[in-house]
Amino acid sequence: VVEKFAALSQAASVVASPQLRNRGTIGGNLCQRPRCWYFRGDYACTRKGGDTCYALGGENQYHCIFGGGACVIVHPSDTAPALIALDAKVRIVGPKGARVIPLEQFYVLPEKDATRETVLEPGEMVLGVIVPAPPAGQRSGYRKVRARGSWDFAMAGLAHAVTMKAGKVASARLVLSGVAPTPWRLPAVEKL
C-alpha cells in the first residue's frame, strides 16, 4: 500500500487519532457524518430537513467554500479524496443485493438532496473498496492542513495521482478535502 497507493497510505495515517485509526474502518471513514455544529446540535437545519442552514450566517469558519448551496457542511473523510484520486470503486451490499459504483459517484451534493451525504439506501452498507492497480509511472500522495498536529479534521487537503510518460504528465487526478460537502475533484486543473 505504501509503495503503490501512497495517497491512501498517507491519508489513512492522518485520520483521527491512533486509537481511532486502530479501531475504525475505511467504510466508516467514507460514511462518517459531517461535523457541522448546527447539524450536530438541536437546530432544525437544512441537513435535517429544515429550511435554514444556520452556518450561512453563523459560525462558519470550518464550512465549505465549494459546492455548498443550501447546506455548507464539509465532508470530513481523509481517505475518500485519496481513493477518488486513485479511481477506486466502492462495493455496497443491502437487502436488494450488491452493487459496485465509482467512489466519485458515492457522495451527494446538497443541491441534489440536502438531507443525504451518500447514495446508500436504507439497509445498505459499504462492504469494501476496490482500488485498481496503478498504471506504470503513477505517483500519488495526500497532504492535509489542520489546526492541530493530530486528531483534527482537514481545514484543506489535497490528494493527487499523477501518471508520467516520457517526462510529461500523461494524466492527473486531483481531489480536495475539507473544502466542500463532498470530496472535490479539480477537472479543470487536471487538464492543464
Where are these regions (language model features)?
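C-terminal structural segment of proteins
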Residues: 1-192
